[in-house]
Design a protein with these regions (language model features):
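Membrane-interfacial helix-loop segments of redox and metal-homeostasis proteins
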Residues: 1-244, 248-261, 291, 298-299, ...
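A structural feature that tracks compact, well-ordered secondary-structure segments
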Residues: 227-231, 252, 264, 271, ...
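Hydrophobic alpha-helical membrane segments
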Residues: 108-119, 265-279
């Protein structure tokens, strides 16, 4: 039949479109919706003040800043709508939607990635432009960073499927919109009805790992973002650390997915930039200078290891360096 075929992509050790792989991303989108809804209620004047779990009146200052008001609509409200779409798309399609409905997967990825990039950009601009932090904005950004490695696996599977269709001289756009079969391959999703809670939890983030060197990259990034508040020096140095810290954390989050583990090399470049910026803007403060040098060297060193790749991704294996 037109859509006959396996659940797992050919050559993969698991199914990135299975329901157990989707629930975590959907749950994070639901969390993002309620947080964005709360922030939007303040921006639109429905509640007078925001409660911030970490930064006092920081959320009030950020949501009412000139930066937020520069958007033609409530940025938090727009984010809430995007999260609703993310939840709806997360529920769409069968457990083999990587081949039965590729356009759904592509739509999901195109929604998650720009939303994540925008969220990170706004987080960077909070201390740089506004001079304050928004606690719920940071929680939202963290949830999005977790969603990105969860979503990227399906996009790889879709890309491989469409490439196979193209090589077989089949109608590309027909396969993109209507899906297709993968006859000749086998791979059914396992029956998880008797699985323990621990087994189900492990299956929900299959293909994602948190090796020690990725953890250290994230710690360096968080330190760079927090350094201006702990070791204040000058505005130029603080702005550089805010920008570089957010970039380092973002790259580390993307690299937690085995299919995008190669992204960690970007943090080697980031480490070199941190070193140069420390020498340029922190030379008047020994503590800030040493912090920049130590952060840069550590970041470069921990961005080299690849770690153990547990799963298999067919032709994509050769791109995991």
């Amino acid at each position: 039949t037109h859509l006959a075929g396996p659940d797992k992509p050919p050559g993969w050790s698991y199914n990135p479109s299975s329901w157990i792989r989707r629930w975590l991303g959907i749950a994070l989108a639901v969390l993002g919706f309620f947080l964005s809804r709360y922030l939007a209620a303040h921006q639109l004047g429905y509640i007078p003040h925001l409660w911030d779990p970490f930064f006092g009146d920081g959320s009030d200052r950020v949501t009412c800043s000139a930066l937020s008001k520069s958007f033609p609509i409530s940025d938090a409200g727009f984010g809430a709508v995007a999260y609703v779409l993310e939840v709806l798309i997360g529920f769409m399609g069968s457990r083999a939607r990587w081949r039965t409905a590729p356009f759904i997967v592509v739509s999901f990825v195109l929604l998650v990635l720009p939303l994540g990039a925008t969220s990170i950009l706004l987080v960077i601009m909070q201390p740089v432009v506004v001079g304050a932090w928004c606690g719920f904005c940071l929680i939202n950004a963290a949830a999005l960073l977790i969603s990105v490695p969860l979503a990227v696996h399906e996009s790889i599977a879709v890309g491989q499927f469409l490439r196979l269709a193209y090589k077989q001289k089949k109608k590309f756009w027909s396969f993109f919109w209507l899906g297709g079969s993968a006859l000749g391959y086998e791979g059914k999703d396992p029956d998880r009805t008797r699985w323990s809670i621990r087994q189900r939890w492990a299956a929900s983030y299959q293909g994602i790992s948190l090796p020690w060197f990725i953890v250290l990259q994230a710690i360096v990034g968080v330190w760079l973002m927090a350094r201006p508040n702990i070791l204040p020096y000058n505005i130029a140095s603080a702005d550089c650390d805010h920008w570089m810290g957010a970039i380092v954390v973002t790259v580390a989050a993307v690299a937690t997915a085995e299919v995008t583990r190669t992204a960690r090399f970007v943090n080697i470049i980031a480490g070199v930039i941190v070193l140069i910026l420390a020498l340029l803007f922190s030379s008047g403060s020994t503590a800030v200078l040493m912090s920049g040098i130590a952060s840069a060297v550590l970041l470069i060193l921990v961005s080299i290891p690849k770690g153990v790749i547990v799963e298999r991704y067919a032709s994509w294996d050769r791109f995991i360096k």
